[in-house]
Amino acid sequence: RWLLTKTGLGASNQFESNGYIRSRAGLKWPDLQYHFLAGAIAYDGSSAVKGHGFQAHLGHNKPQSRGRVWLRSADPADPPRMLFNYLAEEADKQAYRDGLRLTRELFEQSAFDPYRGEEVSPGKDVQTDDEIDDWLAKTAETAYHPCGTCRMGEDDMAVVDPECRVHGVNHL
């Protein structure tokens, strides 16, 4: 449709707005981020609904879980091995559980009445912590593009210092 009329889903950047929330009271800063989409479409272009829809993607701003990247072999042409290790820490799972429940509460507000249909994912039958954890384990992914970022700082987890000097390597 967009090729012919410059209208429809193709005219959108898909992520029309975002927002930040605290998954629980007492946090100094929001720990979760929303990406709101004015369409019900999957990354592969498929649609889980007939007609119009909207969705929210939830991301953790500062997860405790840590992954790793390491060499597959001595051949520099071999791609690296990557373990994202999402949701390895209980605190991260709890933040997503709380975030899902807050998202449901948000979309149950009367302002969404004219637009809201049935919950597609994870679906209204996913309610308990175990059910949410199972859904997360099957569907969680990053909204970002892993490409070689590294921690900056003076601590043991940092790769470079605040002046961008690589720890353990002189003059680089």
Question: What is each model feature region?
Answer:
Residues R1:
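Active-site-adjacent helix/loop segment of glycosyltransferases
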Residues L4-L172:
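FAD-dependent oxidoreductase catalytic-site/capping-region signature
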